Amino acid sequence: IFVPVEIDGELLVDGGLIENVPVSPLREAGARFVIGVDLSAGRDYQRPQDIIDVFANAIDIAIDNVTRSQTSEADLIVAPRLSSYSRRDMSRIPELIEEGYRSTEQLLDKLKS
């Protein structure tokens, strides 16, 4: 969840808890084919060490439930395996990007065959 930002006088907030995979707004805007990205596929929840971890896991579980519901409406789903990554660890972003790229390439290869 990112800090809200103001752009052109409007306050924009992270939609991760509500609209993590915005399939419905895309359909409403006229999209006929929607590719969703499921960043919660195969997630392992870490054993909580303190109350902050408990709340963090609760938020992760809520986000994952919303994501599953929304990705079911997509026509195609890219689902990189991110079980070894934490949503809160920003130091591994290059690895996450590479994993997403790899997953997308694999999906495209399947579609071509």
Regions found by a protein language model. Give the residues of each.
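Patatin-like phospholipase
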Residues: I1-S113
